[in-house]
């Protein structure tokens, strides 16, 4: 008969396999050119991995950053993150299409996008705790009539696990860290139950814009008790307070669609360049399926630090819990940590 220890180990391994379903950004597409992301399955074990625009991180289990770590540097660009040594040139006004390898349907929540200027230091050298992030887009609750609701994360799944981010046309040229994040709220009703999945990339914005909004240090973006962090999704909802600093006036999410990949490209390195944004070649290597475009709208509240995202579809105005509400989904990663504690006992 297997020992308790061996049973515990098998359960832990099963939990680890389930955690790997969370996902990470595998590549970024700009004007049809696909740039490789940080490959958590090979780069950490490669002596000289390629220089990419995606920041490195130690989330080899596709894990998350919990609210208990919001004051630590892990929340900035994920656990033990380090500067990317490459960057992608993007013209102001262009879109960046990020493709996740997968995302679990049960992990409902908002999708938020930030920029942080690297100034004259360069994003490959800047200290991450010095970065000050401002929002360029946010999307949250799409329809809350029936728990757990339809969320931006569901739109991402329907869009082939991908998300379109528009770089503001009036943004000042320079090097920036693009911070793309999904916040999973399936356990958000519990203190420290939310799960943040930040993904960072170095970009160089070209153009003649002059706008550079005031930013917030990454370690000050959220607190564990923010209304949009400790949030129960298992009830009918008519709104959701997206966490983080307010979205600057004039910035908004774009219609979600697809982006054809017609070439592969390599991130550039070294000093800043005045080169134009990458233009795709005519040699097709892959095409992303084109799902139905889904649009969300933003309801801004300039006096508040949060704003709600809804569609024009009417939703229930009652926020009371429904009588037969679904039960929160327990993340396998939490069970795995519990099993480790039991094995050590």
Curated annotation (Swiss-Prot):
Show the catalytic activity. Answer: [(1->4)-beta-D-glucosyl]n+m + reduced acceptor + O2 = 4-dehydro-beta-D-glucosyl-[(1->4)-beta-D-glucosyl]n-1 + [(1->4)-beta-D-glucosyl]m + acceptor + H2O
Q: Identify the GO cellular component terms for this protein.
A: extracellular region
Q: Which residues are glycosylated?
A: 160
Leader sequence range is 1-21
Q: What is its main location?
A: secreted
- Biased composition, class Polar residues, residue ranges: 318-327
The residues the record assigns to binding Cu(2+) are 22, 107, 197
Report the cofactor remark: Binds 1 copper ion per subunit.
Q: Where is the composition biased (Basic residues)?
A: 335-345
Q: What GO MF annotations does this protein's record show?
A: metal ion binding; monooxygenase activity
Q: Gene3D superfamilies of this UniProt entry?
A: 2.70.50.70
**Residues annotated to bind O2:** 186, 195
Entry's Gene Ontology BP terms? cellulose catabolic process
Spell out the residue ranges making up region: Disordered: 315-345
Pfam families from the UniProt entry: AA9
Please report which protein family the annotation says this sequence is part of: Belongs to the polysaccharide monooxygenase AA9 family.
Q: What is this protein called?
A: AA9 family lytic polysaccharide monooxygenase D
Give the originating organism: Podospora anserina (strain S / ATCC MYA-4624 / DSM 980 / FGSC 10383)
Q: Which gene encodes it?
A: LPMO9D
């Amino acid at each position: 008969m297997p020992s308790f220890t061996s049973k515990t180990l098998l359960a832990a391994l099963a939990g680890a396999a389930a955690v790997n379903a969370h996902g990470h950004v595998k590549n970024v597409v700009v004007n049809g050119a696909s740039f490789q992301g940080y490959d958590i399955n090979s780069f950490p074990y490669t002596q000289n991995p390629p220089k990419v625009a995606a920041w490195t991180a130690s989330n080899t289990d596709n894990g998350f950053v919990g609210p208990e770590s919001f004051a630590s540097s892990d929340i900035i660009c994920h656990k033990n993150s380090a500067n990317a040594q490459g960057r992608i040139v993007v013209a102001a006004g262009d879109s960046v299409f990020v493709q996740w390898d997968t995302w679990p349907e049960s992990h409902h929540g908002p999708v938020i996008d930030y920029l942080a200027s690297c100034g004259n230091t360069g994003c490959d050298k800047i200290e991450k705790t010095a970065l000050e992030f401002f929002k360029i887009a946010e999307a949250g609750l799409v329809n809350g009539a029936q728990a757990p609701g339809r969320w931006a994360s569901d739109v991402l799944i329907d869009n082939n696990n991908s998300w379109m981010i528009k770089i503001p046309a009036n943004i000042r040229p320079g090097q920036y860290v693009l911070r793309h994040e999904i916040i999973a709220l399936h356990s958000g009703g519990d203190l420290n139950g939310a799960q943040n999945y930040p993904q960072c990339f170095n970009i160089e914005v070209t153009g003649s814009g002059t706008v550079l909004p005031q930013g917030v240090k990454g370690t000050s973006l959220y607190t564990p008790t923010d209304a949009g962090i400790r949030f129960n999704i298992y009830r009918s909802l008519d709104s959701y307070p997206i966490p983080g600093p307010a979205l600057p006036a004039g910035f908004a999410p774009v219609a979600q669609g697809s982006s054809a990949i017609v070439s592969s490209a390599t991130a550039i390195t070294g000093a800043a360049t005045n080169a134009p944004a990458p233009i795709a070649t005519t040699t097709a290597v892959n095409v992303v399926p084109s799902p139905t475009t889904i649009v969300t709208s933003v309801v801004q509240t300039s006096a508040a630090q949060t704003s709600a995202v809804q569609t024009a579809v009417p939703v229930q105005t009652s926020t009371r819990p429904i009588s037969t509400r679904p039960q929160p989904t327990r993340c396998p990663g939490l069970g795995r940590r519990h099993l480790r504690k039991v094995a050590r006992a």
